[in-house]
Swiss-Prot record:
Organism: Austrelaps superbus
Keyword field contains Disulfide bond: yes
Compartments reported by the entry: Secreted
Keywords: Disulfide bond, Protease inhibitor, Secreted, Serine protease inhibitor, Signal
GO molecular function terms listed in the Swiss-Prot or TrEMBL record: serine-type endopeptidase inhibitor activity
SUPFAM superfamilies listed in its UniProt record: BPTI-like (SSF57362)
The protein, known as: Kunitz-type serine protease inhibitor superbin-1
Amino acid sequence: MSSGGLLLLLGLLTLWEVLTPVSSKDRPEFCKLPADTGRCKGKFPAFYYHPVHRTCLEFIYGGCKGNPNNFKTIDECERTCAA
């Protein structure tokens, strides 16, 4: 196979890895945690994975503490936790 063909194959495999959803067995345990606003009084839009609904939902994050099931964007939440 030529070097161009190898680069194309590598690019396609990388794209497949990025676009393939996370399976439930590969989902991090913290994706099962409930939304946690934290201790601070800020009002920052954030997203968390809701395991019963199997989707990412918005909540208001206080800005500190909380738990790892807390994402700045819905895309980041879906890439990490959604199947």
